[in-house]
Every structure is written in C-alpha cells, then in structure tokens.
Curated annotation (Swiss-Prot):
Protein role: One of the primary rRNA binding proteins, it binds directly to 16S rRNA central domain where it helps coordinate assembly of the platform of the 30S subunit.
PANTHER family per the UniProt record, alphabetical: 40S RIBOSOMAL PROTEIN S15A
Organism superkingdom: Bacteria
Gene Ontology CC terms: ribonucleoprotein complex; ribosome
Keywords of this entry: Ribonucleoprotein, Ribosomal protein, RNA-binding, rRNA-binding
Gene: rpsH
Record organism: Vibrio parahaemolyticus serotype O3:K6 (strain RIMD 2210633)
One GO MF term attached to the UniProt entry: rRNA binding
Subunit relationships: Part of the 30S ribosomal subunit. Contacts proteins S5 and S12.
GO BP annotations, alphabetical order: translation
Coiled-coil boundaries: none
Phylogenetic lineage: Bacteria, Pseudomonadati, Pseudomonadota, Gammaproteobacteria, Vibrionales
Record-given protein name: Small ribosomal subunit protein uS8
Amino acid sequence: MSMQDPISDMLTRVRNGQAANKVAVKMPSSKLKVAIAALLKAEGYIVDFAVEGEAKPELEVTLKYFQAKPVIEQLKRVSRPGLRVYKKKDELPSVMGGLGIAIVSTSKGLMSDRAARKAGLGGEIICYVA
C-alpha cells in the first residue's frame, strides 16, 4: 500500500517517538523530509538527523528532550494533499506568538516563517512547530 501523505507520516512518527520517550525515530527518506529535518535541527527542535542506506534510504531523526520532557510540544500538519494552504508574505502566521515556527515551502526552498517574512516570500504552509 502506498503512502498518501509522507510528510504527515514523518510528523506523526516524531510525535509518537517523543510520546514514547524514544531516542531516535526512523522513516523512509526523501529530499523534502531531509529539508524539514534540517530546518528542525537549525531551529533547535531536534538533536540531529542522518540518512542511511543506498537502495532504500532511511532518515533517522534523533529527538531532543529538556528536563525529561520533549522539546516539541506541538507538531501540526497544515497544508495537506486534500487541502493545500498558501499564504502571502503579509499573511504568514505567527505560531504561539512567535515562540514556535511555521515551516513554509517557498520558491527559494523550505524556511521558517520568520525567514520567509524577512526575505519577503510567501508560500505553502507545511506545518506548525512549537
């Protein structure tokens, strides 16, 4: 059976891994998933990530905890295959009053809502992270 929404699957694996206090979670890899993991690492939400394997590459995400609690409190998919959500640069949302980030897919690649606002770019809102 093919996967309908691989990004939702990735976010769910991270959420479930943190709920079960796992050190790391593995999932099938893709360029978009690696870009999301790189953004989460740059923003400090995960410790690290690595792509393993040649024929069927797997993405391993090392989860981050602070005082035995997950760093990521909320991980919510916004734009999905059945309902795409696009926002102009002036309409980009602020997650939790600026404490969280919205991951935005722009013409210049994936970036946080702050970086997209600074670059003057709008795009597809992939997910909210807080």
